């Protein structure tokens, strides 16, 4: 693969001349693999101006045409599937096993968005339920919000862009995309694909930059909705800075999975091993806390340890690797420090936890205290903690004792146990006989507490990215 370039795309032009540069580093090898050209404040001002001008043009494009363009983009991505999988692995350090899956999911997300473009329906509401409106009638229509600002993270750099651009374009909005700096080459390549698919030149502005660029975009009154996926601290800043504009926030998690005494231990251990360490644990729904009934504690722990130690840690570009590396060495050092803190507080390190550059071997901690960061904060790294319980309600209480509430999992063969846990767990989603880390892209995805506001999934995001306009006929037809 040739040297990577990450470029802003503003007003129909790719910008690189006279811009501040940053090296793109392969996190696994530490080698420079390309250059990122950062947008200036003046570039961002132009992006805002062009998006503001383009929103009426976008709203005027028919639903059929928007659907057709999204379908074509999905087809092009299918043709370039392996190229994008390797690009994500190269820039992020995510194994090909995972990146191939991410590209497949991205194709589905675009296709689902194309379908939703044709479902922007309103309703007719009779007035005769009121004594004042016996002849009156109201009709509702879905109209675009205007300019959608999409701010995306590094951990799923293609699919989470699709989750914002797909619904936003399907609804007829102009879009400004600000991807994570760590994976801006993936975003650049994807915008090129959208243009190849026929997206109007000024429908989409791509801004390469960091926190300052994001702040300028969020606070400007010309953006009508901010769709942000990232950490809770960043989401809180955005919510406080956005004023009265709409915000759609998919934030952090502290994924808890309960393994009850009647669970299938082999199934539970296999899924916890797979979903606790996928993408080096860099997922907001990654399994982090595993509450295990004391009756099966020993058996589950040994089975999980065996499964985890079978995972292959290695080159992300190798099809044999199950785990690559973290996004950078700084992130790996933080996770290493959290593991060491848990050990000092009394936890037993059963396996893994050794760092080499940006890579950390999958770590299993036994019974860390609830005050340890690996329990009470979002680890966002390859670490799971096993915590014993005696009564189901005790496990539910501990799982709920978190500032986050994204997803949870429950393993049990009793329907009443499953339904009780699903009702009582304070999360946006509960997976039965699965872990917290399971999502299909058309489902309503999001959390409560510090895990976010609103729901993603094309059908549900479109609800956020449109307004309901009412037309009233006081005297009927």
Q: PLM features: residue spans?
A:
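Hydrophobic face of amphipathic alpha-helices that form TPR/SEL1-like repeat modules
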Residues: 1-28, 465
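Rossmann-like NAD(P) dinucleotide-binding subdomain of oxidoreductase/dehydrogenase enzymes
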Residues: 126-267, 389
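N-terminal Rossmann NAD(P)-binding subdomain characteristic of aldehyde/semialdehyde dehydrogenases
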Residues: 59, 70-162, 199, 475
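Conserved C-terminal structural/oligomerization subdomain of aldehyde/semialdehyde dehydrogenase
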Residues: 29-34, 258, 312, 339, ...
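A short hydrophobic/small-residue beta-strand
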Residues: 174-176, 349, 429
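Short, well-ordered beta-strand elements within core beta-sheets of diverse protein domains
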Residues: 33-39, 54-60, 149-150, 257-260, ...
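ALDH superfamily catalytic-core signature
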Residues: 233-369, 392, 432
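N-terminal alpha-helical segment of soluble enzymes
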Residues: 28-95, 295, 307
């Amino acid at each position: 693969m040739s040297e990577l370039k990450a470029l802003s795309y503003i007003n129909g032009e790719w910008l690189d001349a006279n811009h501040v540069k940053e090296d793109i580093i392969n996190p696994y090898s530490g080698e420079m693999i390309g250059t990122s050209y950062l947008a200036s404040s003046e570039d961002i001002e132009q992006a805002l101006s062009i998006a503001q001008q383009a929103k009426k043009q976008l709203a005027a494009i028919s639903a059929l045409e928007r659907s057709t363009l999204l379908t074509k983009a999905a087809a092009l991505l299918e043709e370039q599937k392996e190229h994008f999988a390797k690009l994500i692995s190269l820039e992020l350090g995510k194994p090909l096993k995972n990146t191939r899956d991410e590209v497949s999911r991205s194709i589905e997300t675009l296709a689902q968005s194309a379908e939703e473009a044709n479902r922007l329906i309103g309703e007719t509401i009779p007035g005769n339920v009121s004594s004042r409106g016996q002849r009156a009638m109201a009709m509702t229509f879905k109209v675009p919000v205007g300019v959608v600002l999409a701010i995306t993270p590094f951990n799923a750099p293609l699919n989470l862009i699709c989750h914002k651009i797909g619904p936003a374009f399907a609804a007829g909005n102009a879009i400004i995309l600000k991807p994570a700096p760590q994976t801006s080459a993936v975003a650049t390549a994807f915008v090129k694909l959208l243009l190849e698919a026929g997206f109007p030149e000024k429908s989409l502005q791509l801004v390469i930059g960091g926190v300052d660029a994001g702040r300028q975009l969020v606070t400007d009154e010309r953006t009508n909705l901010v769709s942000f996926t990232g950490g809770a601290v960043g989401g809180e800043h955005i919510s406080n800075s956005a004023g009265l504009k709409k915000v759609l926030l998919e934030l952090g998690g502290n994924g808890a999975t309960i393994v009850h005494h009647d669970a299938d231990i082999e199934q539970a251990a296999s899924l916890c091993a797979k979903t606790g360490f996928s993408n080096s644990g860099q997922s907001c729904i990654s399994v982090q806390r595993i509450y295990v009934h004391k009756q099966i504690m020993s058996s589950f722990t040994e089975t999980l340890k065996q499964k985890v130690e079978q995972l292959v840690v290695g080159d992300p570009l190798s099809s044999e690797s199950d785990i690559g590396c973290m996004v950078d060495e700084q992130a790996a050092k933080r996770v290493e420090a959290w593991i060491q803190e848990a050990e000092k507080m009394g936890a037993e390190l059963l396996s893994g936890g050794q760092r080499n550059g940006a890579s950390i071997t999958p770590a299993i901690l036994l019974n860390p205290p609830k005050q340890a960061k690996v329990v009470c904060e979002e680890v966002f790294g390859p670490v799971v903690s096993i915590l014993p319980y005696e009564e189901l309600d005790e496990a539910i209480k501990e799982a709920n004792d978190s500032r986050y509430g994204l997803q949870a999992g429950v393993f049990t063969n009793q329907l009443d146990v499953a339904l009780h846990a699903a009702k009582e767990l304070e999360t946006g989603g509960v997976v039965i006989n699965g872990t917290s880390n399971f999502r299909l892209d058309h489902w309503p995805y999001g959390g409560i507490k510090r895990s976010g506001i609103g729901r993603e999934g094309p059908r549900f995001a479109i609800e956020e990215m449109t307004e309901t306009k009412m037309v009233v006929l006081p005297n009927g037809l």
